[in-house]
Structures are given as structure tokens and as C-alpha cells.
Amino acid sequence: MAAHCRGTELDLSWISKVQVNHAAVLRRAQQIQARRSVKKEWQAAWLLKAVTFIDLTTLSGDDTFSNVQRLCYKAKYPIRADLLKALNMDDKGITTAAVCVYPARVCDAVKALKAAGCSIPVASVATGFPAGQTHLKTRLEEIRLAVEDGATEIDVVINRTLVLTGQWEALYDEVTQFRKACGEAHLKTILATGELGSLTNVYKASLVAMMAGSDFIKTSTGKETVNATFPVAIVMLRAIRDFFWKTGNKVGFKPAGGIRTAKESLAWLSLVKEELGDEWLTPDLFRIGASSLLSDIERQIYHHVTGRYAAYHDLPMS
């Protein structure tokens, strides 16, 4: 991943002036979603690119070593070898961007990836995921333990109460402490946008998280009623762009929750390309958090190569 975001001092004057035009954001989202997807002859290339942005995730209460081991194997070999060969991509080393697990499963992921001879990063959720409603000391210790166990990326959740009550200094202080607890690990800050009340709050929370040194800002835990949506993404991407223009810091973006189909993944790539440009279409600055998306991408690539849709037994389990 790219160098850490340096962060800045908290700029309350900037935050206080923020006001998002809700109607304009909705119009922009509708414009983008109404456009045609990538042309058929280019779809396979774009879908393979999408694979390299996926944080392949398992966050279930019944996760075991075998689940995590299978996840890691799929992360290393995301697309069947013969399909890659048919596309002349078998020598490109295509993998997912990372695997993402609960803190208690980090050791399992590190062990499985090491056994597979693979250097894919291990990301861990932390800070009382998904609600973030535990004591700060506990949340910080959870980060430290995940890093000690081998996680090189930490997906933290913010305390949504601080956003809803306008406690921007407290939010900045908490995320700054998360950043410090991560050490050399990269910090991805989950805003849980479906629980922030307004698009203006989404923009403000995005700014505060970036000022505090977040390397990525992320839409959702995937556990909220409303997860990644285009209106929310547009607001976050504009905040990333404005922060870059003002500070020179490039911060990554990660939508998560409800992104299940290949078509949806292409729409997200197009959105990022339009709002931030090709510079952001790299795993250093763009990720997609997903558990079932990869299976649909592989099915679409199978169809592109063979001309027919795969039966369930045609593709390995993910």
C-alpha cells in the first residue's frame, strides 16, 4: 500500500462551513447510474481489474480456521487458471487486494497465507466492530493486538454518536489515537454512513477522519440497514478530492456492503474514475469490501470465455 496519510491539524472552520446540496448529489448519482456499463469487449479486462481491488472478507460468527484458509486460497487464486490462460492473463499474478477478518482470526489468515507462499495483506476489523460502542481503551487494545498478530491493515469503526452530536474534536482525537495504535499498519476508517443522519454529516466525518490521518475512508461495516450507496460515495469522493487539493494528501476510498454483482463492481470503478481519475484506480487508493462479489465476477468471466454461464459445480468455492 502507498505511504501513510500524514493527516493535518483539525480545521474546525472548514468543517463548520460544510453544507451538502442533497438534491444535486442525487441528480449526479442518477446521471452516473443511468449510463451504460463498460462495452462488452472491454468487460473482461475491467472485471479482472476489479478483482485486484477486492478486500475478500469473512466476518461471520461461525468463522473457523478452515473458513479462513479457504478464503485465503481463493484470494491467491481468485479466477480459475484456465480462464486466465484463455485471456492471456495467466502470468500476471492476479490476486485480491487483501483478506479481511475479525481480530481473533488474524493469526489464522497469516498462517494460511504463509503456507500458500503468498504476501497478500491481512486486514482486520477492530474497535468494537460493527457498532463501535466499547470503551476507548478496549478499542485501542484491539487494534494493537491485531497488529501484533500480523494484520497490516486495520478497518476501524467510528463512534457514530460523536458525529450525530457534532463532537468533531472528540472524533478527531479518537481517530488520531487509532492511527497511533496502528503503528506501521494502514488505517481504514469506517464511517457507517447509513447511521450518520445526513450527507452533510458524511462529508464532515470524512474530513475529520482524513485530518486525523486515515489512509482510507470506508462507507460501511456491511452490517447496517443501509450500506454503500452512490449518493454517499459521491459525497465521500468529493471530500477526498477537496482534501487532496487543499493538503496534497491522497486518501483511499473503500465502499463495502451490498456490492454483490460484477455489474455493480464496474459501476463503482466508473464512479471512482469519473470523480477522482485514473490515479485512484489502484489498490493503494481503492478497495471494495465484499464476500460474495468475487463469485459473480468469476461467473461473468467464465461466460465471456466459454459463451455459457457456469453451473455451481464448474467453479471452486470462495
UniProtKB/Swiss-Prot annotation:
Q: What is its EC number?
A: 4.1.2.4
**Catalyzed chemical reaction(s):** 2-deoxy-D-ribose 5-phosphate = D-glyceraldehyde 3-phosphate + acetaldehyde
Q: Which Pfam families match?
A: DeoC
* UniProt superkingdom: Eukaryota
Show the GO MF annotations. Answer: deoxyribose-phosphate aldolase activity
User: What keyword terms does UniProt attach to this protein?
Assistant: Cytoplasm, Lyase, Nucleus, Schiff base
According to its UniProt record, where is this protein located? Answer: Cytoplasm; Cytoplasmic granule; Nucleus
Any single GO CC term annotated in Swiss-Prot or TrEMBL for this entry? cytoplasm
**Active site positions, chain numbering:** D155, K218, K254
Q: Does the keyword Hydrolase apply?
A: no
The annotated pathway is: Carbohydrate degradation; 2-deoxy-D-ribose 1-phosphate degradation; D-glyceraldehyde 3-phosphate and acetaldehyde from 2-deoxy-alpha-D-ribose 1-phosphate: step 2/2
The principal localisation class reads cytoplasm
Regions annotated as coiled coil: none
Write down the InterPro entries for this protein, in alphabetical order.
Aldolase_TIM, DeoC, DeoC/FbaB/LacD_aldolase
Q: List GO BP terms, alphabetically.
A: deoxyribonucleoside catabolic process; deoxyribonucleotide catabolic process; deoxyribose phosphate catabolic process
Keyword Lyase among UniProt keywords: yes
EC class name? lyase
Return the NCBIfam families for the record: deoC
Q: What does this protein do?
A: Catalyzes a reversible aldol reaction between acetaldehyde and D-glyceraldehyde 3-phosphate to generate 2-deoxy-D-ribose 5-phosphate. Participates in stress granule (SG) assembly. May allow ATP production from extracellular deoxyinosine in conditions of energy deprivation.
Query: What PANTHER family does the record point to?
Result: DEOXYRIBOSE-PHOSPHATE ALDOLASE
- The protein's assembly and partners: Interacts with YBX1.
Family the entry assigns: Belongs to the DeoC/FbaB aldolase family. DeoC type 2 subfamily.
Q: What is this protein called?
A: Deoxyribose-phosphate aldolase
* Origin species: Mus musculus
